[in-house]
Amino acid sequence: MKNHDSKSIPHEQPLVGFVERPWGSFKQFAHNCECTVSLMTVLPGQRLSLQSHRGRAELWIVIDDGALVQVGDAERTCRAGEEVWIRASEKHRLSNRGDAPVRVLEVAFGNWQQDDIQRHADDYRRDAGPRTTGT
Protein backbone atom coordinates (compact mmCIF):
# COMPACT_ATOMS: atom_id res chain seq x y z
CA MET A 1 0.00 0.00 0.00
CA LYS A 2 1.12 3.53 -0.70
CA ASN A 3 2.07 6.00 1.98
CA HIS A 4 -0.99 8.16 2.62
CA ASP A 5 0.61 10.38 5.25
CA SER A 6 2.63 12.66 2.96
CA LYS A 7 0.18 15.61 2.96
CA SER A 8 -1.38 17.63 5.75
CA ILE A 9 -4.90 16.50 6.70
CA PRO A 10 -7.06 19.04 8.55
CA HIS A 11 -8.80 17.74 11.67
CA GLU A 12 -11.45 20.45 11.64
CA GLN A 13 -13.45 21.62 8.64
CA PRO A 14 -11.71 24.51 6.87
CA LEU A 15 -13.59 27.80 6.97
CA VAL A 16 -16.11 28.16 4.17
CA GLY A 17 -16.02 31.65 2.73
CA PHE A 18 -19.18 33.44 1.66
CA VAL A 19 -18.83 36.48 -0.59
CA GLU A 20 -21.63 38.68 -1.89
CA ARG A 21 -21.36 40.41 -5.24
CA PRO A 22 -23.75 42.68 -7.18
CA TRP A 23 -24.72 39.69 -9.34
CA GLY A 24 -25.31 37.34 -6.39
CA SER A 25 -22.85 35.44 -4.18
CA PHE A 26 -20.45 32.51 -3.99
CA LYS A 27 -19.19 30.07 -1.41
CA GLN A 28 -15.53 29.11 -1.35
CA PHE A 29 -14.90 25.63 0.07
CA ALA A 30 -11.13 25.49 -0.45
CA HIS A 31 -8.75 28.42 -0.79
CA ASN A 32 -5.18 28.05 -2.05
CA CYS A 33 -4.86 24.53 -0.70
CA GLU A 34 -4.23 21.16 -2.26
CA CYS A 35 -7.42 19.15 -2.54
CA THR A 36 -9.29 16.76 -4.84
CA VAL A 37 -12.83 17.63 -5.92
CA SER A 38 -15.32 14.99 -7.10
CA LEU A 39 -19.01 15.08 -7.95
CA MET A 40 -20.67 11.89 -6.68
CA THR A 41 -24.04 10.75 -8.04
CA VAL A 42 -25.89 8.05 -6.10
CA LEU A 43 -28.73 6.33 -7.94
CA PRO A 44 -32.13 5.77 -6.28
CA GLY A 45 -32.02 2.88 -3.80
CA GLN A 46 -28.21 2.68 -3.86
CA ARG A 47 -25.48 3.57 -1.38
CA LEU A 48 -21.71 3.71 -1.04
CA SER A 49 -19.90 1.25 1.16
CA LEU A 50 -19.51 2.13 4.84
CA GLN A 51 -15.90 3.24 4.55
CA SER A 52 -13.04 5.20 6.04
CA HIS A 53 -9.83 6.74 4.70
CA ARG A 54 -6.58 7.07 6.61
CA GLY A 55 -4.99 9.63 4.31
CA ARG A 56 -7.73 12.18 3.77
CA ALA A 57 -10.58 14.12 5.33
CA GLU A 58 -13.63 15.00 3.26
CA LEU A 59 -16.08 17.87 3.03
CA TRP A 60 -19.35 16.84 1.39
CA ILE A 61 -21.59 19.57 -0.03
CA VAL A 62 -25.06 18.21 -0.74
CA ILE A 63 -26.40 19.30 -4.15
CA ASP A 64 -29.80 17.55 -4.14
CA ASP A 65 -32.34 17.06 -1.35
CA GLY A 66 -32.63 13.57 0.11
CA ALA A 67 -29.02 12.49 0.66
CA LEU A 68 -28.86 10.13 3.63
CA VAL A 69 -25.47 10.63 5.30
CA GLN A 70 -23.90 8.44 7.98
CA VAL A 71 -20.83 9.68 9.86
CA GLY A 72 -19.74 7.41 12.69
CA ASP A 73 -22.94 5.99 14.20
CA ALA A 74 -25.04 9.09 13.42
CA GLU A 75 -27.31 9.16 10.38
CA ARG A 76 -29.24 12.12 8.97
CA THR A 77 -31.11 13.14 5.84
CA CYS A 78 -29.60 16.26 4.29
CA ARG A 79 -31.09 19.01 2.17
CA ALA A 80 -29.43 20.77 -0.75
CA GLY A 81 -26.72 23.16 0.46
CA GLU A 82 -25.88 21.31 3.68
CA GLU A 83 -22.23 20.54 4.43
CA VAL A 84 -20.88 17.43 6.13
CA TRP A 85 -17.33 17.22 7.54
CA ILE A 86 -15.72 13.77 7.70
CA ARG A 87 -12.42 13.46 9.57
CA ALA A 88 -9.66 11.10 8.43
CA SER A 89 -10.31 7.52 9.65
CA GLU A 90 -13.97 8.31 10.45
CA LYS A 91 -16.51 5.79 9.12
CA HIS A 92 -18.98 7.29 6.66
CA ARG A 93 -21.55 6.39 4.02
CA LEU A 94 -23.77 8.18 1.50
CA SER A 95 -27.15 6.64 0.62
CA ASN A 96 -30.13 7.51 -1.56
CA ARG A 97 -33.52 6.20 -0.43
CA GLY A 98 -35.38 8.52 -2.81
CA ASP A 99 -36.64 8.08 -6.35
CA ALA A 100 -34.26 10.50 -8.11
CA PRO A 101 -30.44 10.61 -8.26
CA VAL A 102 -28.68 12.46 -5.43
CA ARG A 103 -25.49 14.43 -6.05
CA VAL A 104 -22.86 15.39 -3.49
CA LEU A 105 -19.75 17.46 -4.18
CA GLU A 106 -16.79 15.95 -2.34
CA VAL A 107 -13.74 18.08 -1.48
CA ALA A 108 -11.01 15.75 -0.18
CA PHE A 109 -8.14 17.23 1.84
CA GLY A 110 -4.93 15.22 2.19
CA ASN A 111 -3.55 12.53 -0.05
CA TRP A 112 -6.38 11.23 -2.28
CA GLN A 113 -5.50 7.70 -3.38
CA GLN A 114 -8.18 5.24 -4.50
CA ASP A 115 -6.46 2.43 -2.60
CA ASP A 116 -6.92 4.38 0.66
CA ILE A 117 -10.34 2.91 1.34
CA GLN A 118 -11.24 0.59 4.18
CA ARG A 119 -14.66 -0.95 3.63
CA HIS A 120 -16.50 -1.82 6.84
CA ALA A 121 -19.73 -2.89 5.06
CA ASP A 122 -20.54 -3.14 1.37
CA ASP A 123 -23.75 -4.07 -0.49
CA TYR A 124 -21.77 -5.07 -3.59
CA ARG A 125 -19.55 -7.67 -1.87
CA ARG A 126 -16.31 -5.87 -2.67
CA ASP A 127 -13.19 -6.59 -0.62
CA ALA A 128 -12.92 -4.92 2.77
CA GLY A 129 -9.26 -3.98 2.31
CA PRO A 130 -7.55 -1.34 0.20
CA ARG A 131 -9.03 -0.95 -3.29
CA THR A 132 -7.67 0.15 -6.62
CA THR A 133 -11.02 0.86 -8.35
CA GLY A 134 -14.45 2.19 -7.40
CA THR A 135 -15.77 3.64 -4.15
Sequence positions of predicted segments:
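Glycine- and acidic-residue-biased ligand/ion/polar-headgroup-sensing regions
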Residues: 35, 53-68, 72
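Short acidic-glycine-tyrosine-enriched beta hairpin
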Residues: 72-91
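A short glycine-rich, His/Asp/Glu-containing loop-to-beta-strand
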Residues: 14-56
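A structural signal for the main folded, soluble domain(s) of proteins
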Residues: 29, 39, 63-66, 85, ...
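Structural motif
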Residues: 47, 59, 66-68, 75, ...
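Double-stranded beta-helix
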Residues: 3-20, 93, 97-135
